[in-house]
A protein has these predicted regions:
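Single conserved hydrophobic/aromatic residue that forms the stacking wall/gate
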Residues: 1-14, 486-490
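N-terminal Rossmann-like NAD(P)+-binding subdomain of aldehyde/semialdehyde dehydrogenases
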Residues: 15-150
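Conserved C-terminal structural/oligomerization subdomain of aldehyde/semialdehyde dehydrogenase
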Residues: 47-53, 238, 275, 329, ...
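Short loop-to-beta-strand entry elements in the cores of soluble alpha/beta enzymes
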Residues: 87, 177-180, 185-196, 200, ...
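Rossmann-like NAD(P) dinucleotide-binding subdomain of oxidoreductase/dehydrogenase enzymes
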Residues: 140-284, 411
Length: 491
């Protein structure tokens, strides 16, 4: 990391050369290269250039991290709450001191806009403050004794080593979701960021090393599934496995973890419905849908994947929605006036375009879209796209798009709408826009999702976030995240 006095100069140089150097793993309190010496070039989807050389973990590195995390847990769990909170406050201050480096790392590895990168960085700062305070608010319980001969106390103890396998779309926000509650509760953790966006997570490991955070409590590495996530899942050391990613990958993790009984926390794929009724606040509905749909280039698990619009307001909604979508400026987030960056890589863009082509071949009407002209080679930009006349037989209706494509379905009445809202394999987020309290009450119960947002959107570290069906188990954020890593133990 840069000395604080040199930080601004270092950031300026990095912006010019777009090179974050060799990023080492963080295992057992020290920065280290892979036992096998393997490195991987990390290509920015925004520039097409190599921005870092990443030390990639071997199976031996993963085994070492597991052993070090166990040692870290044995030390960390024995510290007092105040001692742990002092260390976490020191870590939070160090993150704030290096906020600019983290910010640019997220921008370059994802191509995010400045505002979108803010979501990542602000979340880790907030989480490292929220969870130590949440631990101070936690209370043990005295349970009644039927015979009157004992005093029964229910206390909360840390489970042990946590292994966290993370998605690429919010590289530091996802770290925040997992690290903050784990270390606040007295657990140690191994962070396995996605190989597609690992730079900022490795930089977080450097920050931990800089302040000499207790060895083994936080560990950061990534690599192939066979060398990292599978050994972690199959190991007998972890007591908690937690993941953010696709439903298909989550199912594999569940199967791999069966070598022992582990606590699982899974935040998986979504297929969020948004219901726009004829009595809605049109400004609020349009602005929220455009903001949600194209934020982070549509690569958000809670983004509205199916937007249902009542026929009596359809034309007005589409006119205003299209006008706002046309105004989105696509490019690299560091450039002035940019509203949306690229998708994560060319492979992801090809999949999105396959879903678009499938919909058009089955009768959908496509407007806008296409690959922007004049972008550098090896970049993965895609213009915002709108699909109308979408029907349930199209892949985009049933699969998570995870890209800047709005799929619109017109409906006449609630009787027409209701059979299309719920799907058998997903239930993460949903949105309802109406001024009818009766409708709000109906759909908050009818929609089979972990979250129902009404007339707007609100997410935060203090609000529980989780799904049902194949969209996951348990919750990130809020005090409920602690239930994953705590054992409630009667004494």
């Amino acid at each position: 990391l840069c000395d604080r006095r040199q930080r601004q100069m270092c950031i300026r140089d990095r912006l010019l050369i777009m090179d974050f150097g060799v990023k080492k793993m963080y295992i057992g309190g020290r920065l280290c290269e892979s036992v096998a010496g393997t490195q991987k070039e990390i290509i920015s989807p925004a520039t097409g250039e190599c921005i870092a050389k990443l030390c990639v973990a071997s199976k031996e590195d993963t085994e070492l991290a597991l052993q070090e995390a166990q040692k870290g847990f044995e030390y960390w769990s024995k510290l007092s709450l105040s001692e742990r909170n002092e260390w976490i406050a020191k870590l939070r201050n160090a993150v704030i001191a290096h906020k600019d480096e983290l910010h640019y790392a997220v921008m370059y590895e994802m191509g995010k806009t400045w505002e979108s990168a803010d979501e990542d960085i602000d979340m880790i700062v907030d989480a490292l403050e929220y969870y130590p305070n949440e631990m101070l608010r936690m209370r043990s319980q005295v349970l009644p004794d039927l015979q009157g001969s004992h005093t029964n106390i229910l206390v909360h103890e840390p489970r042990g080593v946590v292994c966290a396998m993370l998605a690429w779309n919010f590289p530091i926000l996802n770290v925040a979701y997992k690290v903050a509650p784990a270390i606040a509760a007295g657990c140690s953790i191994i962070i396995r960021p996605s190989i597609d966006s690992p730079v900022s997570a490795y930089l977080f490991g450097e920050i931990c090393a800089e302040i000499n955070f207790p060895a083994g409590v936080i560990n950061v590495l990534t690599g192939s599934s066979k060398d990292t996530s599978i050994p972690m899942s199959e190991s007998l050391i972890p007591r908690v496995l937690t993941m953010i990613g696709s439903s298909a990958t989550g199912k594999k993790l569940v199967a791999q973890s069966a070598t022992s009984i582990k606590k699982l926390g899974l935040e998986l794929g979504g297929n969020a419905p948004a219901l726009i009724f004829d009595d809605c606040d049109m400004d609020k509905a349009v602005n929220t849908m455009v903001g949600l749909k194209f934020n982070n280039s549509g690569q958000v698990c809670v983004t509205p994947n199916r937007i249902f619009v009542q026929s009596s307001i359809y034309d007005e909604f589409m006119s205003r929605f299209t006008e706002k979508t046309k105004a989105i400026k696509v490019g690299f987030g560091k450039d002035k006036g940019i509203n949306m960056g690229p998708v994560i890589n060319v492979k992801a863009r090809e999949r999105i375009m396959e879903l678009i082509d499938d919909a058009v071949s089955k009768g959908a009407k496509k407007s806008l879209g296409g690959i922007p002209e004049g972008m550098p080679e090896r970049t993965s930009y895609l213009n915002p796209t709108i699909l109308e006349n979408v029907t349930p037989d199209m892949r985009c209706f049933n699969e998570e798009m995870f890209g800047p494509v709005a799929t619109i379905i017109k409906f006449n009445t609630e009787e027409d709408l209701d059979p299309m809202v719920n799907v058998p394999d997903a239930g993460l987020a949903s949105y309802v826009f109406t001024n009818s309290l009766e409708r709000v009450q109906k759909y908050s119960k009818f929609i089979e999702c972990g979250e129902v947002q009404v007339n707007g959107v609100k997410y935060g570290i203090n609000l529980p976030h989780g799904g049902m069906k194949d969209s996951g188990l348990g919750h990130d954020c809020s005090h409920l995240a602690l239930s994953l890593i705590h054992i409630s133990e009667p004494t």
